[in-house]
């Protein structure tokens, strides 16, 4: 094991002639039948209002070529999640309530520029059919889905766009996983359901080629039957079939439109590495990721219960390692959109994820996630909530220790996200040049085994006492790249025996 010393640096037309002897009498030219003019198809109406976005390499970009990362929230349209504000499939009451919520959210100062819209199965379920599972596809009614796509979902999408927000549509319900299912399988009834849903949505005249609207193909696939016949979520055999499964849906959509598509992973949208080998083909494609405390080696107060995380974590570094292993391979080739994430201390019982904001580079979940996302440079993300009224009720008034609430506790996601999203939208005020740079938690020397990884964390401290993480902005060089390789965002990889200075 070798020691590595770190220091930071910054016709032609052919004319056939015949002899007189072989000349034939000239035949009179018969006029051609006049062609009946063909009706030209009417040009498609362009419904988009927001700046056009597209996928370019690993980034989401606008027409100026600028990288765009979106920040948003979620809405679903079941009365159960909306204070039972309507009953009996009352479209107007649903629209009225949710538009009021959007107005309240904007008035509260939230800086959202996209929404994840659940095409909730409350509207498309045929309740005369037997119940099989929570939010299952087994009771799907195409007739009802078409009706409420026209009457509810598209009008609501138009309202979001009028407020400056892109819309990411998510299909009704969740992927099958528990009995009577073991997961999903190429050619199964759920794949046929998704093909039908996206065939309908991608041909809708107000959605087709409308760049304000994007598609998240499915919600939380867990296991898939691999090419080896075994169900799982991480093996090469599973991702070989995941590529086939979702490629067919991508191809169906692309036969109609070019809207941006977000492809889910496996294991509740936490496993993606296999897609680096079994790539989804086509343009305007990114990956939709879920992230909760305890996943990816992150800190949590309590396990969220899916069986893919834990109630312990190793602070920043173990979180970063887990992210790099499970999401990193696709983040290197395509943009990422985190379509579910939240956290709050366990005592509030207000979020799916139980953890604290913590400190970037240290303990906790929220600040470390933001740090990882910011360093990646191509991650859009949101506040996963089913309670819009809480966002509308938010007040930007600090709480007092001992009297904090879910909404104003700095260790819960609403307070942190409100201010972070504001910074993303308005920019960060930097008070002059930094007074000093700090390498967080570093020693003068460090040893790494071959193939070992370590993450530098660079903090800038300003004269007014404020500080911010600047790792992604720092220039970090190795004195010997044959020994120690420096990857973006402070990642150091030991590639050969020897010594190197950073």
Short names for language-model regions:
Residues 53, 98-99, 162, 432-438:
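A broad structural signal for short, well-ordered beta-strand segments within beta-sheet-rich domains
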